[in-house]
Amino acid sequence: MDATTTSFKSNAKVALGDEQLQRALSGLPGGLVAQRTAARDRLPEFEHLRDVGKEIRDHALEHLDLYLELYERNATAAGAHVHWARDAAEARQIILKICQDADAKLVTKGKSMISEEIALNDHLEEAGLEVAETDLGEYIIQLRSEHPSHIIAPSIHLTQDQVEEDFRKVHTHLPEDRVLEEPAQLVDEARKVLREKYLTADVGITGANFLIAETGSSIIVTNEGNGDLTQSLAKTHVVVASIDKVIPTLEDVTSILRLLARSATGQEFSTYTTFSTGARRPSDPDGPEAYHVVLLDNGRSDMLATEFREVLRCIRCGACMNHCPVYNAIGGHAYGWVYPGPIGSVLTPSLIGVKEAGHLPNASTFCGRCTEVCPMKIPLPKLMRHHREAEFEAGD
């Protein structure tokens, strides 16, 4: 997606004056924040797990080359085709060629922030493919030609009335007098529409919460089951993930999974935690005939040599956003690129440059709540200060 980070101040001003957005954001502090607190309190070893998770991620990043090679070796042995992409353009071209080789017309997608980072949907659509988002929040914002405003809740900036209006505008094949007064009715309608997409898709594309070097597996974590249908019903499954997602062992990833859902939504575990290892075997009842993994660098190797390597520990739980007073005031779109909130204020300048995103590290009260709740103990305020120093030294 095109960055509007240089317009952050004007974006924020518009967001503060948007009454519908403010209504949508008003429930955030009392919802996800309270659920995380309750989940933490129910797990006495939560703080110990944070230390363990940090150590695992630091170790993996310190030996990233070793674990990426191990992952590739084991994934290939399990029947995967592993592709390496230096940047967004290369990743887009690799994925498009996979789709073209599969003679694809329809592509279903699970929720993937990396696909947003590389602007994958636009590229595939420009090549004549139909792309259908299957995560409910992603589907809703796709109808509106918008981008996610939150890492785990893409449509959190919308009210129920707005979603109903969009469904009535787009789902014109359904009866006009149908009742859409309750969230469950909206979900049911989306399920019926998306079911047809699953059954006719040629390629399914998902992200990966983690990649396991020990087994060559990828993991997706969802609450809707859309990821499972996306990757198992299409004949070709494509995983697109950044290189920092690799974890050494199954035991390691189990420790981190205990932190992920609790930090994100307050659940002990998400409803679906799915491991994928290679294509369908002869004895398997379902699954893809071809399994591809696209590993994206896009500046992350360069980050490893800087003080910003700590941000690569991020497991995309969104807790920093939920607890951030700035995010709670303006939402995610004001940040102007893929990653909003405190994590975006550090990651975005690291990926696209301080010149383009220098306003974001200034969008902070430096209250420190983001670091207090981060399951990976990323010192986000400290890293924002480093970006601010770079901006000052550049004279911008």
Model-inferred region functions:
Residues 1-308:
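The feature marks the mature, well-folded catalytic cores of soluble enzymes
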Residues 248-250, 264-269, 322, 329, ...:
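Acidic/polar loop patches that form or flank catalytic/metal-binding clefts of enzymes
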